[in-house]
């Protein structure tokens, strides 16, 4: 026997069922769509959230809150992300963007959070620092400069 002579075992391969091709196929007449109605039609179906005319959940629940247009928006970066830089580097928002740590600089700048550990001695320039972030930067021999 050669590779080109290989065939599946007898009866192992079945033809796929073609819908709507006569009752003998097992999927004729209604083609698996049940009786007539909206869901039996071409393009039939209801939009997400539609509950058959009953007041939908998203309209039964009250609106809540608002967006404060004066809110401060920072890029929040955990301190362990700064281990990517070499010792003695001055870490700025522009450098973080160039290296791909952040995608874009938010309107209020960078905030350094203290999650994780810092093994490098860096000078970090940012708009805000948490207390734990300042402690960890200084413990590693670096400086935290508030812009």
Curated annotation (Swiss-Prot):
Record carries keyword Ribonucleoprotein = yes
InterPro entries attached to this UniProt entry: Ribosomal_uL15, Ribosomal_uL15/eL18, Ribosomal_uL15/eL18_sf, Ribosomal_uL15_bac-type, Ribosomal_uL15_CS
Name one molecular function that GO assigns to this entry: structural constituent of ribosome
Please tell me whether the keyword Nucleus is annotated for this protein: no
Q: Name one GO cellular component term.
A: cytosolic large ribosomal subunit
Ranges of compositional bias, category Basic and acidic residues: 1-14
Residue ranges under compositional bias (Gly residues)?
23-35, 42-52
Sequence segments annotated as region (Disordered): 1-54
Checking SUPFAM superfamilies in the record gives: Ribosomal proteins L15p and L18e
> What GO biological process terms are annotated to this protein in UniProt?
translation
Listed A to Z, the keywords are: Ribonucleoprotein, Ribosomal protein, RNA-binding, rRNA-binding
Protein's job: Binds to the 23S rRNA.
- Subunit composition? Part of the 50S ribosomal subunit.
Q: Which family does it belong to?
A: Belongs to the universal ribosomal protein uL15 family.
The name on file for this protein is: Large ribosomal subunit protein uL15
Q: Which gene encodes it?
A: rplO
